[in-house]
């Protein structure tokens, strides 16, 4: 058994591919491990690309309290709904994304507040509904609607996002958007000034913790800043090579309860 360098008082967990199995289920072992961590005085938070309503079931299942990180770091909000930090996408940039998606015949979701807006109920919208367990709302014209600033935009591609789409959009909207992917079907866009790592630092500061007292676990490239910010980091066994390369430890895959392994073997042994 190997302990972490400093006692962990804050643990940030990615959701999709980390906490949630492919069946969108959190195993009983992971639930017990999170409960044990909380009982030991560790504040556990979600650091997810999801919006609050799409993560509510997970928050309730794990009985989490306090601040959580949503929208890939664009929103930090308590479980009671108090916003601690939020940076949206500029309306003009959001409208440009919608125009681009229309020309390319791609489906786009716009996230305003805690609601998903779409122009049509396409198969991609249905995929979004099933993944998030939230019903998208239809508007006639997203370009006009997005005179208000969205927190996040997502281009949804089925069966998966084409290779090269994420870097292509990152180049096209350089300086205007941060582009990443948390699930194979999503190309996610947020304000370029935000990421999960920055949001984690904000939470640690609110809680009066040093980053050496913070641990984080994730699997995707959008988790890299999260792991880089934490004093101790864990990459899931199903994680990307770049995430594994920067992590302090590599644990089991999501199907093998990697989050529970990180807590049992390292966090609670500190």
Task: Label the model's feature ranges.
Residues 23, 28-126:
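Active-site phosphate-binding/coordination module
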Residues 17, 37, 48, 72, ...:
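Residue-level signal for inorganic ion chemistry
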Residues 5-8, 41, 65, 105, ...:
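A general structural motif
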Residues 62-65, 71-72, 173-175, 229-230, ...:
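Short, structured coil segments at secondary-structure junctions
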Residues 2-10, 27, 188-270:
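Mg2+-dependent phosphoryl-transfer enzymes with acidic/Ser/Thr/Gly-rich catalytic loops
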Residues 14:
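Active-site residues of response regulator receiver
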Residues 30, 55-59, 165, 169, ...:
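Hydrophobic packing residues within well-ordered alpha-helices of enzyme cores
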Residues 100, 104-107, 111-217, 221-229, ...:
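Conserved acidic, metal-coordinating active-site core of Asp-based
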